[in-house]
């Protein structure tokens, strides 16, 4: 991408994000009014956009996670305390996506996601309608299985950042989903993240795998990591293989670890959500 084109794309990044969720600005305003009073308060501020994420099967085990972390999201407004496995199994990079000639640029290049398996007592999983640039469908979530944490990433060694959480990216709780009705129709896309030297053509499976909800995280110490953008979720689809770098380093509030990257897993698209039944 030329400098002038990139500059234009970045100027219109917020518009691209709205297009990415169906071009429904009114729906964005409405969705932000749901949830707890804390979540509603976020709408008084301009929420940063949410990038597409290209996620990889990964392994990294040098993290220390305290017990007693409480997660709050729109499915579980009273929160729940999961058991969090201190091993990263999914690593996500912000990715530039080009679909049908429209470029969705990266707006927060330093903010990645490191995802940890979770287990918990049974949580509410209401049926939802999820809409993005690939279409709209009614989805039935299963129990949450991942906590994705904003993380710094380095290709050469421990990032050594302070604070250890990059700004302007939500935590996410992810739920496996099945399609009840409707369908997504993703075209062939071009993807470029930090692992690729140029845009790569990729095929996206039209059946989504996971829905990731913006999540407030509360540490046992009382420290709160609030929801930054309550409206935009991530809906993740299996995607064909793209270039990888075999080892990176992730850093977040749980520590720093080398991460082994094994294969491309998902393309996660910014999406809006409406609850249709509990």
Q: Predicted segment positions?
A:
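Extracellular/lumenal glycan-associated surfaces
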Residues: 50-65, 109-124, 168-185, 230-246
């Amino acid at each position: 991408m030329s400098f002038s084109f990139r500059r234009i794309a970045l100027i219109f990044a917020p518009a691209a994000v709205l297009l990415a969720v169906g071009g429904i600005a009114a729906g964005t305003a409405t969705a932000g009014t749901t949830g707890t009073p804390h979540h509603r308060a976020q709408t008084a501020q301009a929420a940063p956009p949410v990038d597409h994420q290209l996620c990889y099967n990964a392994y990294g085990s040098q993290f220390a996670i305290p017990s007693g972390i409480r997660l709050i999201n729109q499915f579980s407004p009273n929160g729940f305390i999961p058991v969090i496995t201190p091993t990263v199994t999914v690593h996500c990079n912000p990715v530039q996506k080009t679909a049908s000639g429209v470029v969705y640029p990266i707006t927060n290049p330093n903010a990645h996601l490191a995802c940890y398996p979770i287990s918990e007592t049974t949580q509410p999983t209401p049926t939802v309608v999820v809409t993005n640039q690939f279409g709209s469908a009614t989805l039935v979530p299963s129990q949450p299985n991942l906590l994705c944490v904003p993380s710094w990433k380095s290709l050469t060694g421990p990032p050594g950042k302070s604070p250890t959480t990059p700004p302007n990216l939500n935590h996410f709780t992810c739920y496996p989903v099945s399609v009840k009705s409707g369908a997504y129709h993703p075209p062939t896309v071009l993807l470029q993240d930090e692992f690729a030297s140029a845009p790569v053509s990729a095929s996206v499976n039209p059946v989504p795998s996971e829905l990731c909800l913006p999540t407030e995280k509360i540490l046992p110490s009382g420290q709160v990591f609030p929801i930054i953008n309550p409206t935009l979720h991530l809906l993740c689809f299996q995607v064909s293989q793209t270039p990888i770098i075999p080892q990176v380093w992730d850093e977040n509030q749980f520590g720093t670890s080398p991460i082994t990257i094994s294969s491309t897993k998902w393309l996660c698209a910014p999406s809006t959500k409406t609850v249709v039944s509990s």
